[in-house]
Amino acid sequence: ADMAKVSQEAAEKAGLTMADIEWIGVGTPGVANSATGVIEYSNNLGFNNTPMVKYLETALGKPTFIENDANAAAYGEYVAGAAKGAKNAVCITLGTGVGAGIVIDGKIYSGSNFGGAEVGHTVISVDGPQCTCGRKGCFEVYSSATGLVRMTKEALAANPESAMKDEERISARTAFNYMRAGDATAKQVVDDYIKYLAAGITNTINI
């Protein structure tokens, strides 16, 4: 998608014109170099050394800043959300991938290469499914919404008697919905998902 066009459409949906906007903030998955304005690598979005700040400032004429999306979420929680008042905090985000943001003494921890909290690519199982990063068995492979959909489809293929067979489109909610209705296959999917999620959270705490 054209990020400048998407930004303009978002402003219009909010009832704003670009004249109403002082600056633009971009939260992106992957390694975002906030010093240079370059998205160095984002495996899920296909960005590779993309000069996002330069592009948006040229296209929209507004000061623009980038940050890893999980870092931005973590700082938001630290300032005004669940972590308000804490000295240090970790926020794990679950979506297309798995991300994390770490705040230490009020500052985002970026690491030496702006990838200091890429916990989604810590390995849960060395012989696990392939991750988009190139490794196998990453936390993200099991605990993202994408991973949950994959596990649900695999369980359904192995257990075609499951009531989930009637679902037209498998989503991240499917296994949870059918588990509540008493489906044994769905319950196993959810149990496995929680097991992997717990392992990933525990690893993050131990870092």
Task: Please state what every model-predicted region is.
Residues 1-23, 33-36, 53-64, 76-87, ...:
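ATP-binding/phosphotransfer module of carbohydrate and carboxylate kinases, centering on a glycine-rich
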Residues 30-34, 72-74, 99:
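Short, active-site-adjacent cap segments at secondary-structure transitions
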